[in-house]
Amino acid sequence: MPLQGGLLLAALPNLYLNESPVNYVTDGNALSTYLISQESQRMDQTLMAIQTKFTIATFIGDEKMFREAVDAYKKWILILKLRSSKSIH
């Protein structure tokens, strides 16, 4: 049985993939700008892997795999927030 709402959840990570692989982060005082390229590309690859897992789990109706993808996505968001807070402060 297909998972309800799985396609919508699987589409959410696309919002982050539309960003450029090069991100500019300014510090708290906006005195300097840092170019973060390699780290951003690695994060995009991680997100694409998570999105693939969402899609496959939704397509085959594997609830356990779907939950694993949800957990991975939550961890990815947490890591992203932690890294951006370290870059800003």
UniProtKB/Swiss-Prot annotation:
InterPro entries: Phage_lambda_Kil. Belongs to the lambda phage kil family. Gene kil kills the host upon prophage induction. This is Protein kil.
